[in-house]
């Protein structure tokens, strides 16, 4: 029996009590929870129910009767359609407060820990919260008689929203994407059709090194064949000297994953170089690197503040990517060991260590939950561990290993408060949370990064 008093299509007034983990407004109508994208805490609004479930209603914003002082006009022309950003309509200072609250909500929802007893610090923001993303991944589609469009899929859909400019992207990523889009149209290169499974070019990926100016272009294709390749490469080389690496990645899977397993060089170098905390890093096409290089240094500074190091410690950098975090700490510890499931990332990490003259690091391809127990069996026990997992959080096998290993210091760098809270509830068996530091890596979105210092409990 449906306990929800709301019917689909119904319009009703609502007061927004708080904002949710996806940046939506939350209110209550006859005690039933209502989620309203685009609404802000404290606003009095009129909404229309678009999806009704037993326990909640999703509604669209029809009218604002009382506007929040934190409401601003979103500067992006496709903001509401695109879905890439969720908070452009919220003043930046209020975005930072919301992100701290999102961390609190996650603790409340996924653990039995009382967040009022935790030290959750104010969110560290950016001075200029725009044009920060160093990487773009724009989908392609063919419209009309041969016109090529590039953009992002709308929120919860596979409807492409054409994007001419994106104001959270580094300008060069947009410049390169638009140039390549026009080349694809000029030469009539077949564009991938998701429904039919036909066509060739699926996605245009561009990544830039903000400190070096080096830029990499990757054609994601449905086959090894890339028509008019020679002509396009010649035009790119002539018009875009900043593009120092051009790669092709083949992805024939019918999935939402951008990259396939096979990547090869078309022109220039295999990787681009970026600098971070006075270190140099080579980035290959599939390797993970933080998307906001400006805030990454702030993030790593917070990790550095969290750890107490004397120089005699052994440190594990789990989910190490190209080795950025571990190599930033290599000069402060006896040994760093890192692992990652992407072979190219480990190759990059080894090359980066050599480039930076760092000799006390060891890297291995594999899952953290498999590699760490293997190292322990071989006699290696870390004094400190840094985990920086993907949005899915730490594998449960790794959590078990961490509890078995009992490193005195554990720093968890999270990009998803929900999975962070889930993992903290498990780690609480042996660790206590010293503090949580939210960092805004993705202004204008509901995403929040959190640095958590955990300390082994006394036995």
Curated annotation (Swiss-Prot):
Belongs to the class I-like SAM-binding methyltransferase superfamily. RNA M5U methyltransferase family. The keyword Metal-binding applies. NCBIfam families: rumA. It is an enzyme of class 2 (transferase). One of its GO terms (biological process) is rRNA base methylation. This is Uncharacterized RNA methyltransferase lmo1703. Residues 5-63 form the TRAM domain. [4Fe-4S] cluster binds at residues 76, 82, 85, 166. Its EC number is 2.1.1.-. InterPro entries: MeTrfase_TrmA_AS, MeTrfase_TrmA_CS, NA-bd_OB-fold, SAM-dependent_MTases_sf, TRAM_dom, U5_MeTrfase_fam. It comes from the Bacteria. Keywords: 4Fe-4S, Iron, Iron-sulfur, Metal-binding, Methyltransferase, S-adenosyl-L-methionine, Transferase. The active site is at residue 415. It holds the Pfam family TRAM.
């Amino acid at each position: 029996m449906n306990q929800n008093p709301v019917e689909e299509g119904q319009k009703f007034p609502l007061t927004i009590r708080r904002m949710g983990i996806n940046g939506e407004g939350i209110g209550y109508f006859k005690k039933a929870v209502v989620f309203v994208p685009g609404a802000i805490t404290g606003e009095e609004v009129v909404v229309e129910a678009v999806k009704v479930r037993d326990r909640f209603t999703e509604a669209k914003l029809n009218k604002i009767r009382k506007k929040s002082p934190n409401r601003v006009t979103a500067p992006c022309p496709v903001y509401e359609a695109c879905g890439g950003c969720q908070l452009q309509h919220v003043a930046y200072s209020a975005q930072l407060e919301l992100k701290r609250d999102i961390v609190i909500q996650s603790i409340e929802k996924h653990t039995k820990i009382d967040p009022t007893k935790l030290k959750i610090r104010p969110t560290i923001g950016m001075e200029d919260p725009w044009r920060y993303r160093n990487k773009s991944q724009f989908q392609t589609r063919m419209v009309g008689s041969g016109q090529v469009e590039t953009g992002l899929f709308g929120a919860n859909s596979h409807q492409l929203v054409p994007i001419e400019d994106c104001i959270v992207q580094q300008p060069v990523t947009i410049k390169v994407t638009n140039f390549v889009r026009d080349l694809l149209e000029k030469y009539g290169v077949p564009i991938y059709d998701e429904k039919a499974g036909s066509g060739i070019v699926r996605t245009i990926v561009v990544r830039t090194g903000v400190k070096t100016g080096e830029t990499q272009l990757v054609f994601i294709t449905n086959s090894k064949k890339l028509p008019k390749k020679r002509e396009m490469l010649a035009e790119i080389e002539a018009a875009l000297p900043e593009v120092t690496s051009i790669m092709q990645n083949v992805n024939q899977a019918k999935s939402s994953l951008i990259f396939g397993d096979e990547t090869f060089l078309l022109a220039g170098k295999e990787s681009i170089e970026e600098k971070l905390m006075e270190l140099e890093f080579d980035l290959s096409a599939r390797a993970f690197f933080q998307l906001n290089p400006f805030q990454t240094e702030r993030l790593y500074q917070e990790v550095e503040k969290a750890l107490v190091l004397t120089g005699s410690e052994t440190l594990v950098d789990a989910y190490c990517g190209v080795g950025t975090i571990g190599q930033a700490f290599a000069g402060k510890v006896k040994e760093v060991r890192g692992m990652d499931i992407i072979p190219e990332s480990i190759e990059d990490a080894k090359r980066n260590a050599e480039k930076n003259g760092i000799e006390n690091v060891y890297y291995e391809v594999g899952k953290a939950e498999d590699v760490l127990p293997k190292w322990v069996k071989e006699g290696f026990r870390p004094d400190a561990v840094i985990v920086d997992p993907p949005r899915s959080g730490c594998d449960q096998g790794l959590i078990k290993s961490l509890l078995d290993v009992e490193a005195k210091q554990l720093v968890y760098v999270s990009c998803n408060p929900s999975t962070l809270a889930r993992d903290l509830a498990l780690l609480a068996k042996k660790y206590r949370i010293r503090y949580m530091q939210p960092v805004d890596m993705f202004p204008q979105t509901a995403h929040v990064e959190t640095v958590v210092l955990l300390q082994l409990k006394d036995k």
